Regions:
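Hydrophobic alpha-helical transmembrane segments of multi-pass inner-membrane transport and secretion
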Residues: 1-17
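Basic-flanked hydrophobic alpha-helices used for secretion and membrane insertion
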Residues: 10, 17-168
Length: 168
């Protein structure tokens, strides 16, 4: 019993350092951001370049994200957060399929979609506001792959100001 207790305690003691190391390697490999600046008015390319030119900034990129309603395979409306794909920061890890090659293609979160979603359509709902729909060049996107993002390392995908209030 003592040996079992010692083994259990040793396992618990080393687990933290192993988990921290694993998370550190994962986040470094995918270039997870250190700081995220958000503006309802947006940033200009000059703003992003000014940040990138700072001596202690390794990489800075502008990105766009928007919460929208889409229709799932059962025609139910769900909330999804769409992100532009960046090259230097918050790199995506491809799990299945391939990265988009054209503007009407997208990849989706492997925690929310299965491999069956590849080559299917992600259709934006007509119940989105006109302002939200105007943010997109297309109303329908072909899913080309499943990815993991360092922005979502937990089960929850966040809250939304539309739909049922949950990104799912």
């Amino acid at each position: 019993i003592i040996a079992l207790g010692v083994a259990f305690f040793s396992g618990l003691k080393i687990t933290q350092s192993v988990m921290v190391h694993s998370a550190d390697v994962y986040l470094k490999d995918l270039q997870f951001y250190d700081y995220r600046l958000v503006s309802t008015l947006g940033f200009t390319e000059e703003n992003v370049e000014a940040l990138a030119d700072k001596e202690d900034v390794r990489a800075a990129e502008g990105a766009i994200s928007a919460e929208v309603l889409y229709k799932d395979a059962g025609e139910n409306e769900r909330v999804i957060k769409m992100h532009s794909i960046t090259e230097k920061v918050n790199k995506l890890k491809l799990i299945a399929g391939e990265m988009p090659q054209s503007a009407d293609e997208c990849v989706v979160d492997s925690a929310l979609f299965s491999g069956d979603a590849i080559r299917s359509k992600l259709v934006l709902s007509e119940n989105n506001t006109a302002d939200d729909l105007d943010k997109f060049a297309y109303k329908e996107y072909t899913i080309t792959g499943l990815v993991q993002s360092p922005c979502y390392i937990q089960f929850e995908r966040g809250n939304a100001s539309i739909g049922n209030g949950r990104i799912s």
